[in-house]
Amino acid sequence: MVDIIFHYPFLGAMGDHSKKKPGTAMCVGCGSQIHDQFILRVSPDLEWHAACLKCAECSQYLDETCTCFVRDGKTYCKRDYVRLFGIKCAKCQVGFSSSDLVMRARDSVYHIECFRCSVCSRQLLPGDEFSLREHELLCRADHGLLLERAAAGSPRSPGPLPGARGLHLPDAGSGRQPALRPHVHKQTEKTTRVRTVLNEKQLHTLRTCYAANPRPDALMKEQLVEMTGLSPRVIRVWFQNKRCKDKKKSILMKQLQQQQHSDKTSLQGLTGTPLVAGSPIRHENAVQGSAVEVQTYQPPWKALSEFALQSDLDQPAFQQLVSFSESGSLGNSSGSDVTSLSSQLPDTPNSMVPSPVET
């Protein structure tokens, strides 16, 4: 709030305020003392010249026709303050208007069109589950895919072709580099890794059996050999890999459950916050800072002129006082002129005596 305070030290001889001395008002803008007829005071203790109260960005004068804001001792018009310090969309970095509907994810605010998964670009609707990872939105499917890749130890490795699943078989040896075998004609033999590709029918059969019994016996494995046409070794290795993968996933889920108290999930640098999208809400441009309202003010003698028209004041003496104030010659006149002029005025009610500047 900006208060308009009239600064007239020569009126100190009128009424009960004759014993008060005007304080020294210093302008915050230029740092000099204010000798104007009125000063602008920004609550609580910032005082300005009328010519110094302007926007620090565009130098627009701030008066009763606009709203201004104060931040770090600087004044801004509303347009520049919203542009510099207003809330912007976390996706497109564009500001909001008062009529925009927004989506919120913790401290981030998004346009409805910008509230999309950063991987598949699918728009997140109210009720959809998503996660917030490093200020990026992820839908539930893509977030689960990242967790599975991280659990498998290859976060960004390309997957197999659609419709076929790969199965890696371990080496027959101990995993060390093949050595020379002198007992076989002194020739080097290199072990090769066989890659077996399973079709959808074989994979469905193995998964159904695994769901019923993760550790099938020999009889069950023989039946699987007949049903799938795979070798016993391939079936044995598939069950081993499946159990190992499920064990890693179980350990991961336990780690996630232990961190639910902080609503965060983490895995090898992969951090995210599970959230549920709510309904769009109307954006309220709650900019930080103190709003400043510059009030309109009247000329210093307007109220006194209106009072004179409705009272029995001596008109010649009053007109002389008004013309004397407007000519600005009072500052160069002597103290005897002020005394003789004030003696011609009738007693003025205390309610009409302007108060000096409060410091």
UniProtKB/Swiss-Prot annotation:
Residues 191-250 bind DNA. Its main location: nucleus. GO terms for biological process: axonogenesis; negative regulation of neuron differentiation; neuron development; neuron fate specification; peripheral nervous system neuron development; positive regulation of transcription by RNA polymerase II; retinal ganglion cell axon guidance; spinal cord motor neuron cell fate specification. It comes from Homo sapiens (Human). The keyword Zinc applies. This is Insulin gene enhancer protein ISL-2. One of its GO terms (molecular function) is sequence-specific double-stranded DNA binding. SMART domains: HOX, LIM.
